[in-house]
Amino acid sequence: MTDAEVAQITDNPYKADFPILAANPEVAYLDSAATSQRPRAVIEAQSSFYETMNANALRGLYRWSVEATAAIEGARASIAKFIGAVDKNGKPESQQIIFTRNTSEALNLVASSLGRYTLKPGDDVVISIMEHHSNIIPWQQICKATGANLVYLRMNSQYQITPEEIASKITERAKIVSVTHVSNVLGTRNDIKAIAKRAHTMGAYMVVDAAQSAPHIPIDVHDLDCDLLAFSAHKMCGPMGIGVLWGRAELLDAMPPFLTGGEMIDSVTETSAVWAPVPEKFEAGTQDAAGIYATGAAVEYLNGLDMAKIEKREELLARYLVQQLCTLDFVDIVGSKLGQNHVGAVAFNVRGVHPHDVSSILDMNNVYIRAGHHCAEPLLIELHESSTCRASVAFYNDKHDIDQLIEGLNQVWKIFGSAVSNK
């Protein structure tokens, strides 16, 4: 890296926006792949909802309820624009935004509703070996229920899914292809456009898990050419408990509801019900209006920073992180040793030391990382690892955070190194 590039990640104008980071300058928070921190604007938005318009949205004609409804619909429009879900005139395709609790629920919705609508015995559902459990288990279950086959796209030695692998696994038997945009363990960015092109050529639907991409890179659902895309607010500076599912209008119209109950119907008799139109059809019961409002605030905050600038800064942070880890001869990177191949996350191990021990000692040094299988056990089995350490960066990190991690890892080796060497 050049001195100018290092200077860009030394300067940090962002931490002041985050109360928990500003109040704890001694902490190097490197676990944003698990959950991001929240800026003051988001915290204040959620609080202001309860202070100024707390009412059940969609269910009242009085002012607070009307304002709560407007808050939800305003957030829906902001989120649509954030992921490029706009028509040719630039109008947000708000009705194609469905609120769930998280990405996991959104993917369960897709597997259940689209799976029931689409799959029959002998069909293929194609996913990748690098999926989070949330994009594996729902498909395992629906394949068992329908008699469909679950097929895995596998990586090459560079931790990439090759065009040849895409062509060989996505065949005319494929009916649904569901792939993560970015691996939550390796940080690998998959070529969604190429996978979607093959899926559509074979007559399959394309589903994208964008939980690890939406916080870090610009998203345009039309450019990706996907049919459904899911992500979580809490990984992109929003509150916990809010997920988002976008889908093509005609597909959402055709899919049956996932959950049933209040507000997702047009009419009910003693023996039947008529579903409400999308998105209400998929939003049974009372929504977390305050959380949705705060998610809208998170999107506006990120838009104000410019996602292209966030992507560039985080690329520099990932490159510096990989570069510094490579200076430690007792650390093995799990994944690519090219920093530019990592979006957000870098997995590694300290030779001979369990990741939980590494994480515990780093915690004593005010460095917060993740240790374990990261809800991606099939991937770790493929990599012949039982668990790894994972450091994940966000735009509010800086060079000092990574330097603090390296100092902490040296402390880990100081404690364990001699015992490991004598084994």
Residue ranges and their predicted role:
Residues 1-423:
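Pyridoxal 5′-phosphate
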